[in-house]
Amino acid sequence: MERIRLKLKAYDHRVLDRTVAAIVEAVKRTGADVRGPVPMPTKIKRYTVLKSPHVNKDSREQFEMRIHARMLDIVAATPDTVDSLTKLDLAPEVNVEVRAMGK
């Protein structure tokens, strides 16, 4: 396996950064090289709802949801690297997308 790309997404950036630090530490212990973490643009989803169920259209509330993302590239991954990644206990709030890349 030549290269592994990890894309991590979470609503809380602190949990995301702790997870990224744990992954980087585990990968470096196996001797593989890590590129990143690269902070990706934060996606903001905004929702506007009426405060009143009947009248007063001018009275509204706005909510937003921020999705933070990081990207890691693991270069020269070994079977030990893949093994250590699968054994990691990651936070359930973090969405991890793993993709094996060629050269």
UniProtKB/Swiss-Prot annotation:
Record's keyword terms, sorted: Ribonucleoprotein, Ribosomal protein
Disulfide bonds listed in the record: none
GO BP annotation list: translation
Listed GO MF terms: structural constituent of ribosome; tRNA binding
HAMAP family in the cross-refs: Ribosomal_uS10 (MF_00508)
Pfam families linked: Ribosomal_S10 (PF00338)
Function, as annotated: Involved in the binding of tRNA to the ribosomes.
Protein name stated in the entry: Small ribosomal subunit protein uS10
